[in-house]
């Protein structure tokens, strides 16, 4: 078993994603980003571990699910206080924290972009600088 697939390593992957994707967001937004990652783990459309969800597509051009994993920058935690905060959030969520902020979202993006993929999904919430989405319900045709 690879280290990143071990259960006790999953909180580290979640904390890292929260730090690099949402550390400047309000706490509510950080929890919502954690929900997206955990909602993906629970979905059959995504990998079944936090580390695999976070790193999905890394190394493939335009395939990263989380931009920090493919931006070409060295990822270094420079703000210890912010990291401690996201570690606590990660641990709460991994230990069964209630998922009620994102509206069941499995996707999000920053408000500074308008990706074409977002049109295919239902917007559930905007928190801070992130817009959250879930798969759109298909209407039945008569």
Regions found by a protein language model. Name each.
Residues 1-142:
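Bacterial extracytoplasmic/cell-wall-associated proteins, especially those involved in peptidoglycan
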């Amino acid at each position: 078993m690879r280290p990143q697939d071990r259960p006790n390593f999953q909180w580290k992957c979640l904390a890292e994603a929260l730090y690099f994707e949402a550390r400047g967001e309000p706490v509510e937004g950080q929890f919502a980003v954690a929900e997206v990652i955990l909602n993906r783990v629970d979905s059959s459309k995504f990998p079944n571990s936090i580390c695999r969800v976070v790193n999905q597509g890394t190394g493939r051009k335009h395939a990263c699910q989380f931009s920090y994993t493919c931006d070409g920058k060295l990822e270094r935690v420079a703000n210890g206080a912010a990291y401690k905060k996201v570690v606590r959030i990660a641990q709460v969520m991994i230990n069964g924290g209630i998922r009620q902020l994102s509206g069941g979202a499995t996707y999000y993006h920053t408000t500074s972009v308008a990706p074409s993929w977002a049109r295919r999904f239902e917007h559930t919430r905007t928190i801070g600088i992130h817009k959250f989405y879930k798969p759109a319900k298909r209407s039945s045709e008569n």
